[in-house]
């Protein structure tokens, strides 16, 4: 009886939950660790989103002289936003630690799959296509990984590849005057011969060599350059001494012989790899756009919609300016805030088919209307603080690039005017499922392609409020589009007797 009483009393106590990390994240199991960091699975309790959090001790970082290394990794991850690269969502710090909040990739390392044996040819091809796509995207932005291997390649729950661990990466700014890198980086079995020689090397070519080794491993189940000791393996790498198994097709062998060339001047480029017949099987070039800081929307470039949409000139290289960056994800999905699609929706769908009604939101309340007035923005009183936001009195970036105006013009006229302004700037226009209009650039700048959203709200049966805001792309590019194209086109539609300011330090929140 006494034992039962003790047991009952113990079970009656509620288990004390551990405190939330930074007030937002419920930390789970340890996913992995290295010399300077541990990575945990975590969940944002407010949104339910699963993330991976990389935790680094500041003291270790400072003592090891890795401060510049960490800053470079942050800069690199912010520069390479791509559907096949693990995304950095935010960086936070306390007095003792630095935290990287990153995309959580559920499927784990590609290495674990290879360890069970060689992959089916179709799977190996798809992973290689996605790897080369991501690597080419990085190179076009002056970023070089320098440690490509199956352990640094993850697979998500949709079966798509994600390149991770840019800790050893380099940027073009770090090259010497000879245009080459001189730092030994990488894992010996995957390192190019010119890197082993410890002379200057072209980091792009070295990355592609590593991609070739990865392809061989995926298809064969073992390394192309093997020996009983490291010195013997180095000799084989320097000579390019490898043999392909009998199940490799002639086209695959031709591809590998072109990539695993010891002379970097003769080695296949990323574009050359993409032209190989074995590589092109099932390969779909696609463009993508980053929205809301972490959502990818992908569009195939080879479908009719993309051909009909305004595009860059035909002689523009397909791999950089147009955002044509590789193999499309396997199927439409939304997982971990990542949205992808197999094929592009029509960029000019539903031009006037909605009759205006579904574009209008008839539930504007008093707070909405007040917030439309400059100087009376109450959103800060109601928006949840994410803990990493701006300080009191600062203007959120989205509000800096948002404009609103009241109009008595028919919805169809407003939409036609928006489309004309977008077309004049070489942008495509499409209507989203929520009724908003998206104007999307076809060329990628440093911050990705420009994307501008326009929403039309019903104020009264005779009046509407039009809100225009930047969704993606650079602030300077948006400001140029707004002042040169959008404001002049919409001026006649504004139901307001106040003059429009021609010049101001930042964009006005009303036209």
Swiss-Prot record:
Chain positions recorded as ATP binding sites:
31-39, 54
The UniProt annotation puts the region (PPI) at 400-429
Signal peptide positions on this chain: none
Q: Domain of life, per the record?
A: Eukaryota
Where in the sequence is the active site?
Answer: 147 (proton acceptor)
Q: Does the keyword Transferase apply?
A: yes
State the residue spans of region: Activation loop.
Answer: 165-194
Segments forming domain NAF: 321-383
**Name of this protein:** Putative CBL-interacting protein kinase 13
Q: Which organism is it from?
A: Oryza sativa subsp. japonica (Rice)
């Amino acid at each position: 009886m006494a034992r039962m009483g003790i047991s009952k009393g113990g079970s009656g106590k509620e288990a004390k939950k551990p405190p939330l990390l930074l007030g937002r994240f419920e930390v789970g199991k340890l996913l992995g660790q290295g010399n300077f960091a541990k990575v945990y699975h975590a969940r944002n309790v407010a949104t339910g989103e699963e993330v991976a959090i990389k935790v680094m001790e500041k003291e270790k970082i400072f003592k090891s002289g890795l401060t510049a290394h960490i800053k470079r990794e942050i800069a690199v991850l912010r520069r390479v936003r791509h559907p096949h690269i693990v995304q950095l969502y935010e960086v936070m710090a306390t007095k003792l630690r630095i935290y990287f909040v990153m995309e959580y990739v559920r499927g784990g390392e590609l290495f674990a799959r290879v360890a069970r044996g060689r992959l089916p040819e179709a799977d190996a091809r798809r992973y290689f296509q996605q790897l080369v796509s991501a690597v080419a995207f990085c190179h076009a932005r002056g970023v070089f990984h320098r440690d490509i291997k199956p352990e640094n390649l993850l697979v998500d729950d949709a079966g798509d590849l994600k390149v991770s661990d840019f800790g050893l990466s380099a940027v073009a700014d770090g090259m010497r005057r000879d245009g080459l890198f001189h730092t030994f980086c990488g894992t010996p079995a995957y390192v190019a011969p010119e890197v082993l020689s410890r002379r200057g090397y072209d980091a792009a070519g070295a990355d592609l060599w590593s991609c070739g080794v990865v392809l061989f491993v995926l298809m064969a189940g073992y390394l192309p350059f093997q020996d009983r000791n490291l010195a013997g393996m180095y000799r084989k790498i320097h000579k390019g001494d490898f043999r392909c198994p009998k199940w490799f097709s002639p086209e695959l062998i031709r591809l590998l012989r072109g990539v695993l060339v010891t002379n970097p001047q003769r080695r296949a480029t990323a574009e050359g790899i993409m032209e190989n017949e074995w590589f092109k099987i099932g390969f779909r070039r696609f463009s993508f756009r980053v929205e809301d800081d972490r959502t990818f929307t992908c569009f195939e470039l080879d479908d009719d919609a993309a051909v009909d949409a305004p595009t860059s000139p035909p002689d523009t290289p397909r791999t950089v300016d147009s955002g044509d960056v590789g193999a499309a994800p396997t199927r439409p999905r939304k997982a971990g805030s990542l949205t992808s699609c197999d094929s592009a929706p029509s960029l000019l769908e539903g031009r006037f088919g909605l009759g205006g009604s579904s574009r209008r939101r008839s539930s504007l309340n008093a707070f909405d209307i007040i917030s439309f007035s400059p100087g009376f923005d109450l959103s800060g009183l109601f928006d949840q603080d994410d803990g990493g936001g701006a300080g009191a009195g600062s203007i959120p970036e989205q509000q800096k690039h948002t404009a609103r105006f009241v109009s008595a013009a028919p919805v169809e006229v407003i939409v036609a005017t928006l489309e004309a302004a977008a077309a004049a700037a070489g942008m495509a226009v499409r209507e989203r499922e929520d009724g908003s209009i998206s104007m999307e650039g076809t060329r990628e700048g440093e911050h990705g392609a420009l994307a501008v959203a326009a929403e039309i709200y019903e104020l009264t049966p005779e009046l509407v409020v039009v809100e225009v805001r930047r969704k993606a792309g650079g602030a300077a590019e948006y400001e140029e589009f707004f002042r040169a194209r959008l404001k002049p086109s919409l001026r006649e539609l504004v139901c307001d007797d106040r003059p429009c300011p021609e010049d101001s330090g930042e964009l006005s929140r009303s036209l």
